[in-house]
Amino acid sequence: MDIGQTHLGGLISNSQQDEKVRYHIVGSRVRMACNLVKSLYGGSHRSKLIVNGYGQILLSSQPGVIYDNVKVNHPLVKLLQEYVKKMDVIGDGATFFVVLVSELIQEAIDVIGRGMKPACFSSLLREAHKEIDDLGRELLVEHRIDFEDKESISMVLRGVLKDKWLEEIVVEGISLARSFSSESIRVCKVACGSVEDSYVVEGMVFNRLPEGEVKHARQGRTSIYNCPLDISRTELKGTVLMRTASELLSFSKEENKRIKELVESIGADVIICSGKVDKIYLDFLNKGRKLVFRITSKYDLRRIRELLGGHILSTLEPPAEGSMGVVSEVATFREGSTEYTKFISGSKKVYTLVLKNSVQAVLDEHERMVQKALVVLSKNVSGGKIGLVDGAGRFERRLSKAFLERSAGLSGGKSLAYKCIGKALGTFGSSDVEVYDIYNAKIKALKYSMEFVSTLFETSDYLIGRPEALNIGPRNNQHWDEEDH
C-alpha cells in the first residue's frame, strides 16, 4: 500500500511540517536572545547599557551580567543562561559560546528544512561532539607564564581584557604579587579621574580612616577582635541604688579604671575590631598611642588576619603572644574626596589595583574585567603553562576548514552534520591581529554549544509553572460600623 497517496500520508506530512515550524519558532526565540550579545564578540569594544528591575544602571560587555539583569521566561533561554554561567567559571569564552549557538541553530534549521529529522540531527551532533578534542589539539599552542616577563602575561590577557590601560595595570599587579589569586590582588574603586590614572599600591586598602588620633604605624604588633570596643552590657536589666554623689563618682571611676587596665594589658600597637569603638576606650587608646581600625565586613576581617597573621579573638581580652600578628606599615592616603588606609605586611605580599573612573557603572565593569582576568589565569594555568590558540577568528577558520574537509569524506546525514558545524564556524570573521585565545575556553564553548543545540532539538515540549498568587492585601471588613445584636 502506498501511504503517500492516502489520507494517512497527508497526516504524516502535515505532522512533519508542524514539527519543522515549531523548531523554527523555538530556534528563532533562542537566536533573539543570542543576538543581545552578538555585537559584543571580537574586538568591537562595545558594551550594553542596562537598567535592571531595581533601577540600577549597569554597563557591561559580559553575557553573564547582561542575562542576569534582563528578565526572560522562555525555558530554553533560561537553559542558555545556565550554560553562560558554566562558561564564566572558566573565565572566558561566554560570548563565543552564545554567538556559536546562534549560528548552529540557523544552520540546523536549514538542514532540518531539507528533510532531516530533528532527533536524527541531534544524535549526529552529539557524535561530532566527541571529535572536538582531537581536532582542537592540532591547533593548541603551549605557553609558559613567567612572572619576571610581563609580555608573557600580556600575551594571555590581551584577548581577554581588550583594553590597553586595564591590561597594563593587571599585568603589573600580577608580576608584583607573583600570583593569580584574587586574595593577593585586591581592587579599590575610586570615583574620580579615568582608567589611565589607575595605579598599583602595595598592601590591602580600605576606604576609611583609623578611628583615633593615631593614623600611622610602623613595624608594630597587631591584635584582631571580632567584637566592638565597647562597655559590655548584660542581657538582663538591673538596678544599682546610689544614695550619694560620691557613690556615683566611685562607680564611674571603677569603670574607667577597668577600661584603662584592659587597654594597657593589650600589648598590640595596632588594634582591629569589627564593631563600634566607644569614646572611653578611644580616649585611653589615644593616650597609649595605639592605632585603632574598624572593619565591618567579616570577609575583610578574615583577609586582614591572613595578611597580618595571628588569631581573631571573639571577646575583648588581652591577647596571648601567639595570637598577635605583625604589620610593616599602616598609612593613609587621599584620592578625590575620600581618604583610604593601607596595611602592608612583611610576610605576605598583597597588592591593590586602584581603579579610577568618574562613572560608577564603568568602575564596576572594570572590576568585573579584572576578576575575569584573574579567573582565566587561576583556572587555566597548570604547572606554569597555559594552552592557547590563535585569536582574531583564525582558530575558528581553521577548525571550520577541518570540519568541512571531514564532511567531504563522509556520506549521508553525518556529512550534513559536519558541514553544518563547519559553516557555523566559518561565519566568524578573522584578521591578522596578533592576539591569542584560551584553548580550554574555546573547546568548552564548542562542546557546550553542540550540547545545547542537541538538547533544543530533542525537546518535544516545554512547560512553564505559574507562581502561586499570594493574597497579601488588607482584609476588607465591609460591616465594620455595624453593631452585633
From Swiss-Prot:
InterPro entries: Chaperone_TCP-1, Cpn60/GroEL/TCP-1, GroEL-like_apical_dom_sf, GROEL-like_equatorial_sf, TCP-1-like_intermed_sf. It is found in: Cytoplasm. It comes from the Eukaryota. One of its GO terms (molecular function) is ATP-dependent protein folding chaperone. Disulfide bonds: none annotated. GO terms for cellular component: cytoplasm. Gene3D superfamilies: GroEL, GroEL-like equatorial domain, TCP-1-like chaperonin intermediate domain. Keywords: ATP-binding, Chaperone, Cytoplasm, Nucleotide-binding. Molecular chaperone; assists the folding of proteins upon ATP hydrolysis. Component of the T-complex protein 1 (TCP1) complex. Belongs to the TCP-1 chaperonin family. This is T-complex protein 1 subunit theta. It comes from Encephalitozoon cuniculi (strain GB-M1) (Microsporidian parasite). The gene is CCT8.
